[in-house]
Amino acid sequence: MSYRFSARTGWDVSESGFARAVREAREAGRALIDLTVSNPTVCGFVYGARILLSPLRDAAALTYDPDPRGMLSAREAVAEYYDFHDAEVDPDALVLTTSTSEAYGFLFRLLCDAGDEVLVAQPSYPLFDFLADLEDVRLRPYPLFYDFGWWTDFAELERRIGPKTRAIVVVHPNNPTGHATKAEERARLEAICARHGLALIVDEVFLDYPLGEDDELESFAVGPHPVLTFVLSGMSKIAGLPQMKVGWVATFGPDEARQQAMGRLEVIADTFLSMNAPVQRALPVWMEERGEIQVQILERVQRNLAVAQWSGVEVMKVEAVWCAVLRLEQRGGDVAEELLNAAGVVVHPGSFYGIAERERVVVSLLGEEEDFREGLRRIAGYPGEPG
């Protein structure tokens, strides 16, 4: 018997050639250095388990009192986080979600009908393709280009706006490039959105991890907000707690548009009511304790970045996030697969993030320092590299 599945889920779900090569190498017992690990809970960081887990036992969570936006105490904790970033956020302008992925889903439903378009920077998350497919939204990439740093190609961005375009997505700072959106870039983005009647969606999950000259990155939550703007973040990166499943959307913009957006977002959130009570009650504690894990992560990432920069391998400029793009010597084949086979090092192919140049690969800066140093030593010593 055969069944019909939706066209929106018509992905190629077979194992990729690279994933198969990694699996087969591990099954064969090869000692691989994995430079793709991005889960902080398995990277040797010290979590205050008692402090982080004790609020989950709050008996008050046994009472069900749903609010589509999320518990007020949890939203107030998020608002205080933005106060730390010099931004004034009304708790009533926040909607809690189980993840930033869910937040994207809410916003695509809010802003788009089937077949509408959203502009997304490239390179960027591969996850966007799946999120858009599930909401019957079409993604149109606009390029970031590299010239002693990453920059937005505004001319190309505006050329790609069409009659069905509804929003521009900005990942600030961008993953994997680490490009942080500057004040002048923000002004140009807002001007383009105003000119074309578009919403601005800003993903700030890596905001607390600057690696460049600036000690702090400015949030898009800082006003003014001349256009309808949605700022997304969550505890996966802010507190290194991806397993706790907490994200949110903060809504800004002209009063009438903002009020309409919030009213509709509340209905969308009320339809799913996906947030659970224990996590919401624990959120203020997790937010208060975030500094300890952030310091550990930032120190690790900075040290690993320094190792990469001194390894002899070319590291493309990175201003933030937990990874780096390496530019290796050009070869005929797939660079990531060659490094796996010849050097026993696992890296992400640049194509995973939409990077067209075959010699570029992406490495996580989050892993244990000894493994990272050995991985870069192997890459630098691979034939063709200057190291």
Predicted regions and their residues:
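Conserved core of the PLP fold type I
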Residues: 61-191, 208-223, 230, 314, ...
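Helix C-cap/helix->beta junction micro-motif
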Residues: 28, 135, 195-196, 343
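Conserved glycine-rich beta-strand-loop-beta hairpin in the small C-terminal domain of fold type I
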Residues: 280, 284, 298-309, 314-328, ...
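Conserved core segment of the aminotransferase class I/II
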Residues: 222-302, 382-384
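Generic structural signal for small/hydrophobic residues in well-ordered secondary structure
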Residues: 35, 78, 94, 118, ...
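PLP-dependent enzyme catalytic core of the Aspartate aminotransferase-like
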Residues: 80, 88, 158-159, 338-347, ...
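N-terminal small-domain helix-loop-helix segment of the aminotransferase-like
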Residues: 2, 8-99, 106, 156, ...
